[in-house]
Amino acid sequence: MRTATKTRITAETSIELSINLDSQAESIISTGVGFLDHMLTLFAKHSRITLNVKADGDTYIDAHHTVEDIGITLGLCLKEALADKASINRYGSAYVPMDESLGFCALDLSGRSYLVFDAELTNPKLGDFDTELVEEFFQAVAFNTEMNLHLRVLYGKNTHHKIEALFKAFGRALREAITINPEIKGVNSTKGVL
């Protein structure tokens, strides 16, 4: 089984996170940030992984440290669970509509970290959640997984719908990339390593 568990403790947050890439058991997510709980639940469902997260953070300031540190920890768990990346597709992409919004994700589990984030999130807050933290989250995931990640909202009006389309597209693209393909012998790279 491709699994990983990490604990990350700083002066600002305490994160316990585990993933199982080959299980679709019910995910248990409690971050202290309601909107992020919602998005991570969607991500887990659409990536068809089991994701468990327990986080305590300095949310009395804002959610920045909590959101970023969860992204870091998720990225580290993905990197560990994928190990040498033998026989995985490596690449994944998905378009996801959410009512009037359309989100797109393309990713490469290349071992090279990069994020392209192209989304106009016109509403700066959804409840207590600062929408600029969406990019911070994906930056942390991409750099700690060592993936090349492209996210784009092609169009839409409702900020919640735009973000939801991105998280679902990310989940679906990740599922494609991490799927073991029996036609791929070893690592899917001419370099022989990812």
From Swiss-Prot:
UniProtKB keywords: Amino-acid biosynthesis, Cytoplasm, Histidine biosynthesis, Lyase
Catalytic activity: D-erythro-1-(imidazol-4-yl)glycerol 3-phosphate = 3-(imidazol-4-yl)-2-oxopropyl phosphate + H2O
GO biological process, one term: L-histidine biosynthetic process
GO molecular function, one term: imidazoleglycerol-phosphate dehydratase activity
Compartments it resides in: Cytoplasm
Location (main, coarse): cytoplasm
Keyword Flavoprotein carried by entry: no
Gene Ontology CC terms: cytoplasm
Matching Pfam families: IGPD (PF00475)
CDD domains, per the entry: IGPD
EC numbers, comma separated: 4.2.1.19
Pathway(s) per entry: Amino-acid biosynthesis; L-histidine biosynthesis; L-histidine from 5-phospho-alpha-D-ribose 1-diphosphate: step 6/9
HAMAP family attached to this UniProt entry: HisB
Family statement drawn from the similarity comment of this UniProt entry: Belongs to the imidazoleglycerol-phosphate dehydratase family.
NCBIfam families with a match to the protein in the record: PRK00951.1-2 (NF002107), PRK00951.2-1 (NF002111), PRK00951.2-4 (NF002114)
Protein name in UniProt: Imidazoleglycerol-phosphate dehydratase
Annotated source species: Listeria monocytogenes serotype 4b (strain CLIP80459)
